[in-house]
Amino acid sequence: MTTTNILRWTSIAVLAGLVTAEGSPSGGAQQGPTPADLENTDISYWLGWIWVAIIGSFIVYQVVFHFIRYVRTVACLSNETQRYFAAPSVMFGRFKKYFLDAPLFRTRHHREFKLSTAINVGTLPSRLQMAFLIGYFGTNVAFCVISINWSGTYKEVASEFRNRTGVLAVVNMIPLFLLAGRNNPFITFCGISFDTFNLIHRWFGRIVVLEAIAHSFAFIASKVHSTGWKSLAATIKHSDMIMWGVVGTASFVFILLHSPSAIRHAFYETFLHFHIAAVSLAVAAVWIHLKELPQLRIMYGVVSLWVFERTCRLILIIMRNVGSGGTKADVEVLPGDAVRVTIRMARPWKFRPGQHAYIYMPSVGLWTNHPFSLAWSDEEEDLSEEKGLAMNRQDILEMRKTSVSMIIRRRTGFTERLFKKADLSPAGKFTTSALIEGPYGGENLTSYGTVMLWAAGIGITHQVPHVRDIVASFANGTTATRRLTLVWIIQSPEHLEWIRSWMTTILSMPRRRDVLKILLFVTRPRSTKEIHSPSSSVQMFPGKPNVQALIDQEMQEGVGAACVSVCGTGGLADDVRRAVRMRETVWNVDFREESFSW
């Protein structure tokens, strides 16, 4: 069992234990639980079982979905028409069109709202995401107020409300921290993307902050009403519990204020360091605040999840990068403000399409690590005489040299420093020590008879591995895919250099012409002479594509069930989403959008 799988199962075991333990009374351990404490216990249980129900529903959906994909793949290996799988379920098609794949309003989902070219204020959630967020937010609001005796005295009502909001804030820290990790087990088990879980993590954080603020204001209101402001100041000064409660709430408010999209995107590395520091302070403050309360056991679980996830990440980094001379990175400048980074791995791994990894380059950014799509992988044997004859499994692994490559576009921060260092190096290349963490993600599209891959600019790095995998599987007879179309939109023909060597390899693969068609669209050609089509299966056009027309054509000529995947700008993703949704009730087509946000 791999380290990642061990982490996934252990995280689930910890969470299951917390669901049964989280409903502890909210105070007065020496005096026994009050009726209000028991109500808080019940509400904590209800919230925990809501998590279980939601997660269980998605897991069941994924099991059914993967079973259907498996049956479809086996049934279509020798089926050239696949007509049975081309027809959609009318009810499920409508569900996808109007809910599962639908943006919140009309067509805009992934295209960012911007105050200027440098200030991004975020995107709109999808209809399904918004329904979940509203439902969970509403559930927390309801749980904050139900069963409270609103007819009681001011002090009694404030005390009940204070305890209720405090308990809910602590309980909600469990999913908040679980969803923050890169090794979140539910990405795999629920089939929910890291991008969506990141969105949920941010909103769970806002809920925790609001409940912490409500908890603090309820205490302040009760104290001031009873004994006045001077007594409040004295209580904060002389009570460690209250003082650290104030520190915790202040830390939560700071996290809320420094986390808007505009700040995260403009100053990501600075944001990340401040975020970790503020979260650490908030957790320490809450820990001390709960020192004599039963809810401290929930903080044991919260901190354990965070420490365990970080420990497993460290173990994974050591396993991937220690030995055989360590991991090295070859960085090469490419036309169009980009670099190719080839990571020569200390230890091999099994590469799958759709994966990404985090890279650390101390010589470029000492404390930073960034995620990038893995565009290519090569594996070769080290046949040097120094290695000698392989005598055991470890010798065999050491003789296998794996390299993974990625294309990184020049932006700001780390990518800017990386590009400049390569550009100033002799021949536009340099080699440095590096660490790689991963791989994360991965997706298999070989159960679809028709696959259409859309990419804009650097988004091609996500789609190239799928092209290679499907063409190889087609030649081996291990895929249902009979029609594969790659649509790549670039600004200049010089961007073709990013993947030229890889595409040369793909175009020379057996039976490539029988399955693969490539459409290139150059939006800003310098002259018409730059636009030429090498063959009927690789065609180049000036300008932007008509997304709806190309997808409609694919529907007319496609085979069996289809998948349309897009990785690129927000505008392209929204256009492709709209075109696919227009056909989901008449064509068995699934939509896949690859994006990475923070």
Range-by-range predicted roles:
Residues 26-36, 280, 397-401, 406, ...:
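Reductase modules of NAD(P)H-dependent flavoproteins
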Residues 264, 269, 273, 277-289, ...:
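Membrane-proximal cytosolic interface modules of multi-pass membrane proteins
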Residues 340-351, 355-452, 468, 523, ...:
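FAD-binding FR-type
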Residues 56-60, 130-145, 164-182, 200-221, ...:
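Hydrophobic alpha-helical cores of multi-pass transmembrane domains in eukaryotic membrane proteins
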Residues 56-79, 178-186, 260-266, 307-325, ...:
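Transmembrane-helix exit/juxtamembrane "anchor" motif
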